[in-house]
A protein has these predicted regions:
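Exported/periplasmic ABC-transporter solute-binding proteins
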Residues: 20-47, 51-60, 64-68, 77-80, ...
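Hydrophobic h-region of N-terminal signal peptides that target proteins for export
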Residues: 10-19
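Intrinsically disordered, low-complexity proline-rich regions
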Residues: 1-2, 15, 56
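Sec-dependent signal peptide recognition
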Residues: 2-10
């Protein structure tokens, strides 16, 4: 009897200790908000007592915060360069690719374009083109890389013309904070801030769910840009953080990402 009671007491103490463990703090690209929320819930369900605390923002700005000393356990970026910079600075482990994305055009209800006419419409001086902020947000970097590809595809001067006219509406250090629990892209387009916005295809899906009148236009393969997402463990992260990273990279975690439109890295 005493042995049984001792076993029960030990099990209870073990469970209580697990329940009191600090949450795994994850800082992640804003484009991962819905997907990583589901990954975190699936991880918590698979590991009783484990908790995940999520924070989202533009990957470049998150990288700067971590470089300046903010504490986190896991950093999930919309590119490989930002987590690699933290690794190079001795603050994190080498990053691992865990997902990929592509660019799409999110058009206002009245914006007329097809994949075949999209480039010409973007180059139209009357069309307002929205992007995220380069350097601060990889989505902006990818959009500007797309402008370069448009020029290389036979449109001399297109890169500079598009860069000059691009409205950098989100993702920058001075950008208005995104609305809580709503797609910033859907909100910007609903407010008439641009005629078309170049962003990730996964963001377009979320924006259209909230604003069904918005249009999705596929970016032609010849000028599209692949986005490769990287994740790293920050130095000082404990075993729960390692387990979360392993779950994210596992078939179970990858299945959740795929449901949200992310492809394999």
């Amino acid at each position: 009897m005493k042995r049984a009671l001792s076993f029960i007491a030990a099990a209870a103490l073990s469970f209580a200790a697990a329940a009191q463990e600090p949450a795994v703090k994850v800082l992640a690209a804003g484009s991962l908000r819905a997907a990583l929320g589901d990954v975190a819930r699936a991880f918590e369900a698979s590991a009783p007592g484990r908790r995940v605390e999520l924070g989202f923002g533009a990957s470049g700005l998150l990288k700067d915060r971590l470089a300046a000393g903010e504490r986190a356990d896991v950093f999930a970026s919309a590119n490989m360069e930002h987590p690699q910079a933290l690794a190079d600075a001795g603050k994190a482990a080498p990053p691992q690719a865990f997902a990929s994305n592509r660019l799409c055009a999110l058009g206002a209800a009245g914006f007329q374009a097809t994949p075949q006419t999209l480039v010409e419409r973007l180059l139209d001086p009357a069309v307002r083109v929205g992007t995220s902020t380069p350097k601060a947000d990889p989505a902006g970097d990818y959009a500007f890389a797309m402008f370069e590809r448009i020029e290389q595809a036979g449109h001399p001067g297109a890169r500079q013309r598009l860069a000059d006219k691009a409205l950098q509406l989100t993702g920058g250090p001075n950008s208005p904070p995104p609305p809580k629990d709503r797609s910033v892209y859907g909100a910007l387009m609903a407010a008439g801030q641009a005629d078309v916005f170049i962003t990730y295809c996964t963001n377009v899906v979320v924006a259209q769910r909230e604003e069904p009148t918005l249009r999705r236009i596929e970016v032609p393969e010849a000028v599209n840009v692949a986005a490769r997402y990287g994740v790293t463990l920050l130095h000082g992260a404990g075993e729960p953080a390692r387990q979360f990273l392993q779950f994210l990279l596992s078939p179970a975690g990858q299945m959740v990402l795929a449901r949200h439109g992310f492809a394999a890295p």
